[in-house]
Swiss-Prot record:
Belongs to the HSF family. This is Heat shock transcription factor, X-linked member 4. Coiled coil: none annotated. InterPro entries: HSF_DNA-bd, WH-like_DNA-bd_sf, WH_DNA-bd_sf. The gene is HSFX4. Residues 29-39 have a biased composition (Low complexity). GO terms for cellular component: nucleus. GO terms for molecular function: DNA-binding transcription factor activity; sequence-specific DNA binding. Pfam families: HSF_DNA-bind. Residues 79-182 bind DNA. SUPFAM superfamilies: Winged helix' DNA-binding domain (SSF46785). Residues 1-66, 227-275 are annotated as: Disordered. It comes from Homo sapiens.
Length: 333
């Protein structure tokens, strides 16, 4: 009985419906698979969903191009690049509308408001510059040698900034290597000036020490001269005084005091041996006889000998302190 009922149900399914077409629930030439694959079922559902809504892909919101991280120089992170190279890269990219080149390609034009929203307000992995403030960004431009040029006086350019640098040009990335931060240049200059400073100090100290040593040696020589001057000057001065006095006595008998100096062309001459003082004329003898020259001879003789001794000992001390191995000023420099 069960088999007959099954055959009747199967024949009813195969019976043609009105119009000669099989019923909607009947099989189409093959028996259905009692255990269909689950992957095939999922594929059928996805195909049905796509057929029901064919415009679903087209209606998805497009990705904002300005929110993408630009891949520069073999996909390196843009945030790790230097400031000039970051700026040059975003100017070269058409993605950013807030920055662009001028007509000559030697200056960058920046829209203040749009640049603030488009570039500086980026967060997280999409961040490009370390600062999010326009004032700090302008300060960075100045530190890297960018100069601001005034745009035209048209009302539409009030929010535009134009900055230029001789090493910041369109399609010339190699020039960016010449752009350096000002504080880095200042530190390099300071290091260059610090090199000869210790040598200069040593030279000054060496010259000063030699000068002090020479001064002390001269002072000692002067003291030696002052201590030895009376013993040297005494006998010669006394001798000259005695001889001048004796000569004055002899000349006093020959020439009275009221008479003037004699005019004898071939008169006797006498050379003294005390202190390099020579009396060679009778006029000098007459001055000695009158007592005018006797005191002057002693004082002049002593001062000349004292000056001679001072100069001699000072020169001797200077020569003694100078060693042959001492470098000259030119060699020290």
């Amino acid at each position: 009985m069960a088999s007959q009922n099954t055959e009747q149900e199967y024949e009813a399914k195969l019976a043609p419906s009105v119009g000669g077409e099989p019923t909607s629930g009947g099989p189409s030439g093959s028996s259905p698979d009692p255990n269909p694959d689950s992957s095939e079922v999922l594929d059928r559902h996805e195909d049905q969903a796509m057929s029901q809504d064919p415009g679903s892909q087209d209606n998805s919101p497009p990705e904002d191009r300005n929110q993408r991280v630009v891949n520069v120089e073999d996909n390196h992170n843009l945030f790790r690049l230097s400031f000039p190279r970051k700026l040059w890269t975003i100017v070269e990219e058409d993605t950013f509308k807030s920055v662009s080149w001028n007509d000559d390609g030697d200056a960058v034009i920046i829209d203040k408001d749009l640049f603030q929203r488009e570039v500086l307000q980026r967060k997280g992995a999409e961040r490009i510059f370390k600062t999010d403030n326009l004032t700090s960004f302008i300060r960075q431009l100045n530190l890297y040698g960018f100069c601001k040029t005034r745009p035209s006086n048209s009302p539409g350019n009030k929010k535009m900034m134009i900055y230029c640098n001789s090493n910041f040009q369109r399609d010339k990335p190699r020039l960016l290597e010449n752009i350096q931060r000002k504080d880095a240049l200042r530190n390099t200059a300071q290091q260059a000036t610090r090199v000869p400073t210790p040598k200069r100090k040593n030279l000054v100290a060496t010259r000063r020490s030699l000068r002090i040593y020479h001064i002390n040696a001269r002072k000692e020589a002067i003291k030696m001269c002052q201590q030895g001057a009376p013993s040297v000057q005494g006998p010669s001065g006394t001798q000259s005084f005695r001889r001048s006095g004796m000569w004055s006595k002899k000349s006093a008998t020959r020439h009275p005091l009221g008479n003037g100096p004699p005019q004898e062309p071939n008169g006797p001459s006498w050379e003294g041996t005390s202190g390099n003082v020579t009396f060679t004329s009778s006029a000098t003898t007459w001055m000695e006889g009158t007592g005018i020259l006797s005191s002057l001879v002693y004082s002049d003789n002593g001062s000349v000998m004292s000056l001679y001794n001072i100069c001699y000992y000072a020169l001797l001390a200077s020569l003694s302190v100078m060693s042959p191995n001492e470098p000259s000023d030119d060699e020290e420099e």
